[in-house]
UniProtKB/Swiss-Prot annotation:
<keyword id="KW-0819">tRNA processing</keyword>
<comment type="subunit">
    <text>Homodimer.</text>
</comment>
<dbReference type="InterPro" id="IPR020103">
    <property type="entry name" value="PsdUridine_synth_cat_dom_sf"/>
</dbReference>
<dbReference type="InterPro" id="IPR020094">
    <property type="entry name" value="TruA/RsuA/RluB/E/F_N"/>
</dbReference>
<feature type="active site" description="Nucleophile">
    <location>
        <position position="51"/>
    </location>
</feature>
<comment type="similarity">
    <text>Belongs to the tRNA pseudouridine synthase TruA family.</text>
</comment>
<dbReference type="GO" id="GO:0160147">
    <property type="term" value="F:tRNA pseudouridine(38-40) synthase activity"/>
</dbReference>
<comment type="function">
    <text>Formation of pseudouridine at positions 38, 39 and 40 in the anticodon stem and loop of transfer RNAs.</text>
</comment>
<keyword id="KW-0413">Isomerase</keyword>
<dbReference type="InterPro" id="IPR020097">
    <property type="entry name" value="PsdUridine_synth_TruA_a/b_dom"/>
</dbReference>
<feature type="binding site">
    <location>
        <position position="109"/>
    </location>
    <ligand>
        <name>substrate</name>
    </ligand>
</feature>
<dbReference type="GO" id="GO:0031119">
    <property type="term" value="P:tRNA pseudouridine synthesis"/>
</dbReference>
<protein>
    <recommendedName>
        <fullName>tRNA pseudouridine synthase A</fullName>
        <ecNumber>5.4.99.12</ecNumber>
    </recommendedName>
</protein>
<dbReference type="InterPro" id="IPR020095">
    <property type="entry name" value="PsdUridine_synth_TruA_C"/>
</dbReference>
<dbReference type="Pfam" id="PF01416">
    <property type="entry name" value="PseudoU_synth_1"/>
</dbReference>
<dbReference type="InterPro" id="IPR001406">
    <property type="entry name" value="PsdUridine_synth_TruA"/>
</dbReference>
<dbReference type="GO" id="GO:0003723">
    <property type="term" value="F:RNA binding"/>
</dbReference>
Amino acid sequence: MKIALGIEYNGTHYFGWQRQANVTSVQEKLESAVSFVANEFCQIYCAGRTDSGVHATGQVVHFDTKAIRSEKAWTFGLNANLPADIAVRWAKVVSEDFHARFSATARRYRYLIYNHPLRSALFPTGVTHHHVALDHHLMHQAGQYLLGEHDFSSFRAAQCQSNTPWRNIHHLHVFRQANYIIVDIQANAFVHHMVRNIVGSLLEIGSGKQPVEWMDWLLTQKDRTLAAPTAKPDGLYLVEVKYPNHFNLPKNPLGPLFLGEPKIDFHHD
């Protein structure tokens, strides 16, 4: 039997998704809980291997098991055996041809920036604090240069193991809610550190250090050393993974926290 799970987690205290020796990972905690509930070892496969300190509200995973449990039993049983910063939002029996990573058609991330001169005591984690005033309109305009299929070498980490730097960005929206700026980006897939590297350069543009057209220039140069430093992991969330409709997977409300779909006409920003 193959089971898919919708997972959310606060990645602050984890060295990323992937199991590694001598450090704590989300995969390790989840595999331990699933294996306990299933009464057999179950290996977990995820849609997106998030880095150290990165969070998720819409991670999707799957595992194979001989255990017969109801979807409700999987959800409540796993949550009873997971730490407080990892939670299962849904469980579903899926067909044998489903794979959390290879069946996915798109991944969507949100980067949450607390844009205020003073830091917040209520959100010491889960957001990236940027004290310099940012113009989210300029950031949004710059992001439109990245839409479509491109070579994203300028936003690719040096240690990236992908065979190709080509990716297809479906949308990139930047919007503000009070003191929070949200960068919402969806693509077929991402190279290593791609979202955080893009956000790093958007911050330069939003703070007035670089013009909007700089983003277009960076893309054409295909040189990571020319772009801005990588943005911190604190504000990054994997919020949605998309699959073909025939898998009929449940959908979590888009997060994090209070964030839903923005009611903004981006064409007139």
